């Protein structure tokens, strides 16, 4: 059985082009592993593959979830395992592509069986963050679960919130749940590739890509999204670029300010992604260029090597 191919990397690193090259080379079908690209209604601002790209290979879980839904990593994992089975049943190779490290961890290391977080625990953690800031949130996370907290970046707001929410909801440390997990994919069933480009070159591409998004109509897309009046705490409402463009549309900042904030947020996110993949996917193969042709050539070399 040909292993699944996992292609990861920071935002704007060229993962879509690489996944298409891989699909055409091995007879693959592409599965989304980006937590924002799952949502409908935001194809431009979340950089989902366009119609021409989708025509080159079958694509799954892109723009398929209503943004009013909180789509959890557990739901994603369940959906992906079913897709992997279907794709293999057709004799094709599953190719998972994206930048959400938690998704890749869920597949390759297992998903902790944490109970559903209730509204009260979620609100309590959010109130703590509002009152005491990120430093206060991290202090509470360290109190509740020093093991899990010391594994995450001190600036990783989402993961720190998760640690605190689990502690508030269950009275048990997240690391306790994580200690007894079985990975859905055995090591022999997958091989991983990380795109790890020069940081300054990546930052330039991030800035250029956001300009292209605006030219393609991202502001109108966000305006339509805004009309749904969704909870600003929903994951889709926090997609990169969405909050500053909404602030601009509400008259709270100029378009130039929104543009600068969106680029800044994307660069910071890319930095966190790079750190995560260096630490959590250290054994994966590396591609260190943003040049599409060079990256595809490097991919071919990796695929020519025997798995393992």
UniProtKB/Swiss-Prot annotation:
Cited PANTHER family: TRNA DIMETHYLALLYLTRANSFERASE
Cofactor(s), by name: Mg(2+)
Gene Ontology molecular functions: ATP binding; tRNA dimethylallyltransferase activity
Subunit architecture: Monomer.
Organism from which the protein derives: Maricaulis maris (strain MCS10)
Protein name: tRNA dimethylallyltransferase
NCBIfam families noted in UniProt: miaA
Alphabetical UniProt keywords: ATP-binding, Magnesium, Nucleotide-binding, Transferase, tRNA processing
One GO biological process term: tRNA modification
Reactions listed under catalytic activity: adenosine(37) in tRNA + dimethylallyl diphosphate = N(6)-dimethylallyladenosine(37) in tRNA + diphosphate
Name of the encoding gene: miaA
